[in-house]
C-alpha cells in the first residue's frame, strides 16, 4: 500500500483516474472521468504518431487501425487509453527540404502540400476514433473535452519550412486547428536558424522571422522554440508579446545538447510566462542515452522547477518521433510512470497537476488573450505576390474606374500605372 511519504504508481493512477486501468478497451465501454479540480490526465506537448502513420503505414488508415488492434511504434488507441492521455498536441511534421540554406519558394512547395496531407490524416484519425478523441481549438475546448472523458487533440507544425514561405498559409493552418508552430526543425529556414544546422545564417531570427513571430502573436498561434538556435531563442523572447513554449526540450545544465535550453534562456522564459515541456528523448535526457530513465526525466523537471518555478513546466514526449525510448517510458501507456516518479521525488500534487496540463492550458488561454488584445493594432503580415497584370492593363482599369480606390494608403510617388495613363492621355 502506498504511504504519504512514498507515493507509488498505484497512487498516481488513483490520482489520475477513479476507474481501474483499462487493459483491453474492447472489454470496457467506460470513459475515464476527469477531476478538473484535482490531478487531470496527462497532457503531451509533442507526439509524432501522424509521422509514424505516414512513414511506416504509408499514409493508409485501414483495418489495422481498428480500436482493438496493436500498432507498431509508441502509440495506438489502446495504449493512449491505458496511459490516460487527456490532451495531446499531435505534430503534423514533415521533413525539411533537401540541401542547406535554399530558401526559395519552389523547394518548399512539397513541404506545404505534405503538411496539408498530415492535417487531413489527423482529421481522418479523429473521425475513426470520434468516441475517444476530439479536436480542440481553444483552451475552453480542452477543458470541455477533458470533462467528457475524451482525449483533447490539438495540432502543432514542426518548422516554418512547412508554410512554403507564406504567411497566408500560416493563417490557413490556424483556421484548420494548428495551434503551435515550431520555428525551425533540423535545418535553417527563411525565418530562423536551427540548432542542428551546419552553420547559422541569420544569427538568430531574420527580419522575416521577427515579422512571423508578430503575426503568430496577432492570430493566436503559439510560438514553439524547440529545435531553434540559442540566439534564436533569445530573439524570439525579445519579440513575442505572448508566452512561448518549448514543446519537447530539456535542461542544458543537465545534458549539454544544442536541443536543450540553457539556464539564462529559462530565466527569460519565466519573464515571458512561457513553459518548457520536458522531453522523453534519451539523448536529451541523459549524457549516456542508453542509461536514460524516467528518473532522469524528473531530474530535468526538478531543475527547471527549482530554478524558475513549476508554473513553467509541461511534458512533451516525442513518442513516435525517436527510434528508442527512456527506460520506464516505453510508450504512451507509461505516462502514469512519470506522474508516480514526480510524486515520489516530492513534487506536490498541485505542481504535478500544473505540469500534467494546467500550465499549457494557461499558455493557450494567454496566447488567445494577446491575440484578442492586439486585434486592429498589429498589421496583417501580407505575402509579397508578384504583379500579375502589366502596367498597361492596370492603367486601363484605373482609367475605367476613376473614382475607385487605387493606390495604397500613404503612396506619394507617381506610379508606373499613373505614368502609363498620362502617356495614353
Curated annotation (Swiss-Prot):
Catalyzed reaction equations: an L-aminoacyl-L-amino acid + H2O = 2 an L-alpha-amino acid
Keyword Metal-binding: yes
Residues engaged in binding substrate: 185, 259, 318
Keywords: Dipeptidase, Hydrolase, Metal-binding, Metalloprotease, Protease, Zinc
Upregulation: Expression is positively regulated by the thioclapurine cluster-specific transcription factor tcpZ.
GO biological process: proteolysis
The keyword Ribonucleoprotein is assigned to this record: no
Cofactor(s) the protein needs: Zn(2+)
UniProt cross-references to InterPro entries, sorted A to Z: Metal_Hydrolase, Pept_M19
E.C. number: 3.4.13.19
Sites where the protein binds Zn(2+): 46, 48, 158
MF terms (GO), sorted A to Z: metal ion binding; metallodipeptidase activity
Functional note: Dipeptidase; part of the gene cluster that mediates the biosynthesis of an unusual class of epipolythiodioxopiperazines (ETPs) lacking the reactive thiol group important for toxicity. Firstly, L-tyrosine is prenylated by tcpD, before undergoing condensation with L-glycine in a reaction catalyzed by the NRPS tcpP leading to the diketopiperazine (DKP) backbone. Afterwards the alpha-carbon of tyrosine is oxidized by the cytochrome P450 tcpC to form a hydroxyl group.
PANTHER family: DIPEPTIDASE, MICROSOMAL DIPEPTIDASE
Family statement: Belongs to the metallo-dependent hydrolases superfamily. Peptidase M19 family.
Protein name stated in the entry: Dipeptidase tcpJ
Gene name of the encoded protein: tcpJ
